[in-house]
Amino acid sequence: MKILVLASRIPFPLEKGDKLRLYHQLRHLAPNHDITLCCLADKPIDEDQTHALSSLVTALHVLPVSGPRRWWRMMGAWLSPLPFQVTWFTDGKAQVALHTLLKEVEPDVVFCQLVRGAEYIKDFHEVPKVLDYMDALSAGMHRRSHMAHGFLGPLKRWAMRTEGNRLARYEARVFEYFDRHVIISRNDRLLIPHRDRDTVDIVPNGVDLQAFGPTNSPAEADMPTLLFTGNMAYEPNVDAAEHLVKDILPLVQTRPVRVVLAGAEPKQRVLDLASAEVEVTGWVDDIATEYHRATLFVAPLRLGTGLQNKVLEAMCSEVPCVLSPHAFSPLGMPSEGHAVVCGDPQSFATAIDQLLSDPSQQHHMAQQAKAQIQKNFSWESHVAGLEQILKDAAQ
């Protein structure tokens, strides 16, 4: 099958959730299909990206999105009904280039990741199209609007509510232009504002079972280590990091204890959290090493949508997890025996202290969670489901 894939970013390196999801989907689709990958980018692809992706696809095309034209479009974005992020990623010259490629390649099906790329292909009717919503972006934006504070808080809340409303209308409208639709979790599907949302197929993320399996020689920790990972420029992760350090850590009775915030592109707000008890790593070449030296994984996420790769990775690495309902619910498994789910700072602190004092409970919970992840969250099984959806659309 000839598949043309449209991505709003080059899916490497894997420091963002959309990149990680698409990279592993390509990795498992590649052996059996002819894939043309088209990526939007505002700078040339580098050697590492080319090396990582060229072995996965038959052809790799980078569609330049001009910086000056992008900012010119944004000046008029307030007058457009399109979501701001759709305007940001939609470039006229890139669209012409993509349509030329579509006519040259003649794919059996087009796979578009995220609604921000939908304008490029929604009116191209010569080929079946599949849209990966990935997350319910409109719901995520509305949640973030409630957490905007400070001097610019009112302006930020208004802008986020506006974007959330535009995204909701767009998620509903663009539904009609695609033959099939997929999304990351049942929770997110419930938030898609369309009468036929139940027809959206669930394609969860997976986890690399070998890369994140438990190690036979875990790093020796000089003190209990609480780990939180993720792209530290992404607002839901920034908020969770601040919540962990400012609201939860002071209530933890166990001392000494260390918090590690591991992830790329830390904002200044995250860097400012560093202290004698808090380590901010920045980019980590192999994030699995951070799981292997952690005692507990703590994810007090309050914002965002979708299934969290970080939770899958922690559980697969046999790290006991203390999670917010927001982080745990998309897994679709019972919390009993798999994680401790907490809704407020004191319950987080109490759970952390209890687990740190009970290695037997840590081990039992880690084993139970790992078994569930190995059973239900392999990339192979989930990409097989996506492959069948693409085949059905192409017929």
Predicted regions and their residues:
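Acidic donor-binding loop of glycosyltransferase active sites
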Residues: D179, H292-G306, S317-P320
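A short, well-ordered alpha-helix in the C-terminal region of glycosyltransferases
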Residues: Q361-N376, H382-G385
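Conserved acidic donor-binding segment of nucleotide-sugar-dependent glycosyltransferases
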Residues: A339-Q346, Q354-P359
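A short, active-site helix/loop in glycosyltransferases that binds the activated sugar's phosphate group
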Residues: E47-Q49, E119-I121, N165-T199, Q268, ...
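Acceptor-binding helix/loop patch of EC 2.4 sugar-transfer enzymes
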Residues: G67, W71-F84, V130-R169
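N-terminal subdomain of nucleotide-sugar transferases
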Residues: M1-V62
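Conserved catalytic-core segment of nucleotide-activated headgroup transferases in glycan assembly
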Residues: L167, A172, H194, D198-R293
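Short hydrophobic beta-strand element within catalytic cores of glycosyltransferases
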Residues: K310-E313, P320-S324
